[in-house]
Every structure is written in C-alpha cells, then in structure tokens.
C-alpha cells in the first residue's frame, strides 16, 4: 500500500479537532502503527514560550521509567581514569584529542555525547558540528559531569534530552509501538512532568498549550493536557 493511502486509512476514525484523554490517544496511535517495523511513538508539546528570549528557553533531561526502546550509542570525551570509567560503564566511543579529530573529520559514531569538565575547552571546538545536532555537552542537562558512570548508564538506560524548538515546541520519542499502553502512558507523564518542572521564569500565560501523540508513520492525535498533568 502506498504511503499516502496508508496514512489516509490510518487517519480514519481520528477527529483532528477533538482532544482525547491520554489513554485513548495512545490506544488510537498504537492501533494505527501498522508498518513492518516497530514504529517510534512520539509526542509534541506546544509551549507558551518564545525561545528567542534567553529567559524563556526550556531544556532538560529525564529518564523514562520504561526506557525508549532505542539503543543509543554514547560517546565520552575524557582522559585517564575517567576514560576507563566511561568504558566500564558501557560507553561506545571514548577519547580525547583523537576523538575530537574524528568528529572534526565528519565521523560521528555516537548519538549522545558526554564530557568531563576539563575536556570542554577541547570539545568547544566542535560546536559547529555537534551544536546543530543537539549533541553538544551541557552541564545543565548533566552531560558535562565528573559522574561519568551515572551519565553513561542514564543515557543507555532510557534518558531523553528535550529542548524547545524555535516554534515553541518540544518533541521527543517516548517508546515503541510494541510497548504496552500503560508503559507509554507512564513515559509520557514522566516527560511532561519534567517539561512542566523546567518552566522558565519568563514564561507567561498558559505554559503547556497543546499536546499531540503520533507514531512514525501515523497521524497525530491531540491529547487533553489535563489528562496528562492531572
């Protein structure tokens, strides 16, 4: 079936104007995730912020109670004992100057990046490469740290970084279509709670304005925010 026809069929039964309770929305999304691969379940949260203003930036990290269903490759910039600690914790790529050179050369063999504080002057050279990919280590989200073991295990165990985009939207994958409905609900509530707690001082009016969930190839289903936050 062509993608257009499949999406049209998947949209049947979804009222695009209605706000559904979270459990109902998840059920509908799962029922419409009919691709041959295990689709990612995604959430989009529209926030009442303007990220062009520094006091309205929203970002953070949260460990989902049921993981993401995705295997992340973790890269760590560290030397000596901290490099050994990273390897022992399960990091996929560990290095210092050598790793910086590889990244500068266009070879990025990781999905999440962690660094010890002493490495940041070196890692800072990679801003133009890692920044646009949302991979630049940042102490605010725990990816610049001396606690390498917990940072690596957190990244491997289902932690999700979130950051508001220019349009005021936070988007994240919160599991797979193969997950049980209850597990997806728990993950969404954990993420939304973290986003809520990250509300910036400069935010005015209604903070969480609209929420929608979808699968990789399926239609978006709007969610009643109160059914998540309540």
Swiss-Prot record:
GO biological-process terms attached to the record: regulation of translation; translation
CDD domains (UniProt xref): Ribosomal_L1
A GO term from the CC aspect: cytosolic large ribosomal subunit
Transmembrane segments annotated in the record for this chain: none
Any one Pfam family match given in the protein's UniProt record, by short name: Ribosomal_L1
Keyword Ribonucleoprotein among UniProt keywords: yes
Keyword terms of this UniProt record: Repressor, Ribonucleoprotein, Ribosomal protein, RNA-binding, rRNA-binding, Translation regulation, tRNA-binding
Gene Ontology MF: a single term: structural constituent of ribosome
NCBIfam families referenced in this protein's UniProt entry, alphabetically: rplA_bact
Subunit comment: Part of the 50S ribosomal subunit.
HAMAP family: Ribosomal_uL1_B
Stated role: Binds directly to 23S rRNA. The L1 stalk is quite mobile in the ribosome, and is involved in E site tRNA release. Protein L1 is also a translational repressor protein, it controls the translation of the L11 operon by binding to its mRNA.
Family indicated by similarity: Belongs to the universal ribosomal protein uL1 family.
Protein name: Large ribosomal subunit protein uL1
Chain's gene name: rplA
């Amino acid at each position: 079936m062509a993608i257009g026809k499949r999406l049209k069929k998947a949209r049947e039964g979804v009222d695009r104007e209605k706000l559904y309770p979270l459990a109902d929305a998840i059920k509908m999304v799962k029922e419409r995730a009919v691709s041959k691969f295990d689709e990612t379940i995604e959430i989009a949260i529209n926030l009442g912020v303007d990220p062009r203003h520094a006091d309205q930036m929203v970002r953070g990290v949260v460990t989902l109670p049921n993981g993401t269903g995705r295997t992340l490759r973790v890269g760590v910039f560290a030397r000596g004992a901290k490099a050994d600690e990273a390897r022992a914790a399960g990091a996929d790529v560990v290095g210092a100057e050598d790793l910086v050179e590889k990244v500068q050369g266009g070879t990025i063999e990781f999905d999440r990046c962690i660094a010890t504080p002493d490495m940041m002057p070196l890692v800072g050279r990679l801003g133009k490469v890692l920044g646009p990919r949302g991979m630049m280590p940042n102490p605010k989200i725990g990816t610049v740290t001396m606690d390498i073991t917990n940072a690596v295990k957190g990244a491997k165990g289902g932690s999700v970084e979130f950051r508001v985009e220019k349009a005021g939207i936070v988007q994240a994958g919160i599991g797979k279509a193969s997950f049980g409905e209850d597990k997806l609900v728990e993950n969404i509530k954990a993420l939304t709670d973290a986003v809520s707690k990250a509300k910036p001082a400069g935010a005015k009016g209604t903070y969480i304005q609209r929420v929608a969930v979808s699968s990789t190839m399926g239609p978006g289903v709007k969610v009643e925010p109160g059914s998540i936050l309540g």
